[in-house]
Amino acid sequence: TIEVEESPVLAKITIDGNKKIRDKKIKEVLSYRVGMRIKPNFINSSMNKIRKLYKEEGFFLVEINAITTPIDRKNTQRNNITFTINEGKKMKIKDIIIDGSGKNNFGWLATKKWIPMPRLLRETMTQYKLRRQLKDTKIRTWWRFWASPFDKKKFTDDLDALSNFYKDEGHRDFTILSDSVYYSKKKKGLIVRINILEGSKYKFRNFSWEGNSLYGENVLQSALNLNKGDIFSQTGFDKAVFQDVQSLYMDRGYLYSNIEPFFTPAGKDSMDVHFSITENNKVYVRNIN
């Protein structure tokens, strides 16, 4: 005969040693209920979830232990679990590495190709310019001793800021391939590594329009105020289309008009933009209360 021993039932979970993150927030990530069977992988899975939560708050040296104890000697099938946490200190950022930024230079001096300087110096200036786009993710140095510890949410916002910077510099196809955060060799700080794909730096080649009956192409192009040969900027393009051109229709009562741009690459560094306009019906005001 084969005897199968049932997994014990969970009676209670206790969190001990936590000062920076409240019990409620920790228990929310554990996804448990009192009375459930304690499966063999539940404890390890729970410890990993707690560890992930702490790392997102900047506590990369957190240590977690778990102890399972029966509620009493007679009832060994109802167990309490205690997670003991040694939070450690929040870790500062020792270095930020942006891989994949070698094709293009950024920063006023680095972009002046007529100024003779070593390639390494240009790359260093570019890295400095790119790091400056990360508003809240900063390397701690002796002159920036106030730099905050790593914060996952702020880092996510900073990645968006880096993407916006590239797209405003003409790199419409810019992509962040991956990002990672890990200890330095002696665990004295964190290394933030961002792998990127810059893509081509685009300029406008041609503009074309369809669906426009209220305005001729010359009027629309004048309102757009973008010229052939201009470097693409996502912020500038969005303003030109969805504010400047769109306002022509809004001012005449076409509140539901729609402008949709389509991009077609032309060669390595140029693109054509075709605008499809759906003017829809004019909106009239019936009553004003």
What is each of the regions a protein language model found here?
Residues 1-289:
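Interaction-mediating elements
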